[in-house]
Amino acid sequence: MAYNNDKIRKSENKKGASLRNPAPSLRGRAGGEAALKDGWAADIAEAVKVMKQGGVILYPTDTVWGIGCDATNAEAVKRVYEIKKRDDSKALICLIDSDKRISRYIRNVPDVAWDLLNIATKPTTVILDNASGLAKNLVAEDGSIAMRVTKEAFSKELCYRMQKPIVSTSANISGEPAAQNYRDIAPELLEAVDYVCKSRRNEHEPHVPSSIIKLAGNGEVTVIRK
């Protein structure tokens, strides 16, 4: 479908915004305070440590549980494909904590991208062209990458502390149902990764994958998954 400028106003304050790079901290931020309050600090710190060493983790996200790693580490990304038994020609999603990070990894971000992120009422993954600075085996053959800004407290703080995009692919073997909760994760996946986050393991409410929207450079929007 074509983008309609009459229905959605541009977010001029987002366009070209530069990202400050503060020292990661759990204090002084809304997400960080929530993480401390819920006892997530040690869990997040260990997950970040493992990913910075090239490891693979299982973690709760704003949608279903995910398999994650440093999205700039090609060897770690390769392991995610192997663990998931997924064809490496199928690109994976990256999770970030703020839309201000997008311009670090996407050259020439279309104005409409900011609008799509602002109006989204549910977790929404946006596929953008001209990916840069990410593991080559994470980027699609056409040079695009799927990115999602998480608003969920745990995964948001995890991304913030990592200071890089984190791979976020559903915690299941390719072709099998996604793990909506921790209890749904197959034992072989739990054994295959380097760290399994301890937070949010007791949740039982159903979760679903995100919407996926592909955004072309000319502003054309295609809905891949509602």
Where do the protein language model's features map onto the residues?
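Active-site-adjacent structural elements in enzyme catalytic cores
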Residues: 2-16, 32-226
